[in-house]
Amino acid sequence: MSKRAQDQDEDMREAKSAFNVGDRTTVDDEGMGEFEDPWEDEVESDQEVIIENDADDDEDMDMDQVNNEIEMDQDNENEDKDIRVYLPGQALDKDEVLEADQSAYEMLHSMNVRWPCLSFDILWDQLGDERCTFPATAYVVTGTQADLAHNNEVLVMKMSQLAKTKNDDGNLSDDDSDDDDVEEDPILEHRSMRHNGGVNRVRAMPQRDQQIAATWADTGKVHLWDLAPHIRALDQPGTMVPESSKKPIYTVESHGRCEGFAMDWSETVPGRLLTGDLNGKIYMTTLNCANGAVSPDRVPFVGHQSSVEDLQWSPSEKGVFASCSADQTVRIWDIRSKKRAGLQVKVHNSDVNVISWNKKLPYMLASGSDEGVFSVWDLRQLSQNAANPTPIATFKWHQAPITSIEWHPTDESVLAVAGADDQITLWDFSVEHDAEETLNGTSQKAIVNEAGVEVPPQLMFVHQGQQDVKELHWHRQIPGCVISTAGSGFNIFKTISI
């Protein structure tokens, strides 16, 4: 499966989500790193009614006439919009377009970038955990897929003044706190580092006290970066980033010229990095966080018959990790054995593109495939080379390859999934059918409108509007907040469902 962005348009289209069908709008987006403002024409579109009382005797008549005209205008507007709920799979008429239902979000912002970014990671900050107030702030690191190799960059971005989303009537919800009374435009600040070649994947160390990131380049090299000076420059106006800090602190060359996409840092052992390439080889590199020394292991883990697509360290066992491959398998490895995986299971009938290890339930692993199917596996029930392994849950909701999958950082039953069908879906596996909804042992799914779209009860939310969605992540310090990247730019949102 090719993970590269196919369309790299300089003019990015507006990203919208949780869609209704309404009138077509045209938006021109220019420049790099700009937040979109869906309300910028609000003042011009408002209509003001001016009442002139030339005679006291005519006052009641004039008021009745004005009220009648207002009601007629409102009725006409409602008839013209013809808004209805949209679900993937439904056909749109020629004059219809998808529009976001703002009331479905607590927060929704979209951001355009000059070049598409295939991958990113969210950085720890010092603003506290469990943040639920607005405006919000988030830090991310990402890398570009530019037109020419020397135009690529690693970007450290700070998104601030992320206000609570207005409802479709332009008002904030009734329970908004006082800090929403004065709404300001969102702010994007960034610092950049030149990167040789396109950036296939970016991963930041998960430890709070480390600001180290790794980038997988399409040149076959893996670069390590110290992001601390760039974050300080974003937080302290006037601070300059030394030229020496704009270069990698180390470059891993274990893969030769073979590029890859799979990469993961260990949460249990700081500094341990895994990288997997298109030749099916996996290498481990160790960074000593105390003195900065880097030790690449030149002997790879071998066994996959095709490209390694994703890697995940075990959240509980220091020397165990999982890999998935285009050979349709998931393998569980012990770092003491490089020639043979401890467990090898064929989990899909096509390329296994992504995996995610549940951090709250370490025996749960989710996988997403090239055929649009994603599954949840209980590792305790899997056996070596099982012919027909049975997942505890599997869904074929997405109509194109699964491109990203990630468990919620604190809720073990919630999963986010992204697909090449331009959908991001949020699932809650704690939701089950009531007994009354089950007939003759067969689960009865909801049928939605004339399109006959079956909606699983575990599906909590469908976010759309981005084109060519590549990757998503939950924000660990803002509960329910998701950030995603696509060919059309970034979205940062928080729904009312999760």
Show where each model-derived region lies.
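Beta-rich catalytic cores
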Residues: 116, 136, 150, 198, ...
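Beta-propeller domains
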Residues: 2-5, 9-192, 220-252, 286-296, ...
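Hydrophobic beta-strand positions that form the internal "hydrophobic ladder"
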Residues: 140, 213, 273, 321, ...
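Per-blade loop-tip surfaces of WD-repeat and WD-like beta-propellers in eukaryotic adaptors/scaffolds
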Residues: 160-164, 180-184, 219-249, 266-364, ...
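Residue-level detector of Asp-centered blade-edge/turn motifs that repeat once per structural unit
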Residues: 124-127, 133-136, 206-209, 267-269, ...
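Repeat-based blade/solenoid architectures
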Residues: 110-123, 192-199, 255-258, 398-402, ...
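Blade-level signature of beta-propeller repeat domains, shared across WD40, Kelch, NHL, RCC1
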Residues: 471-498
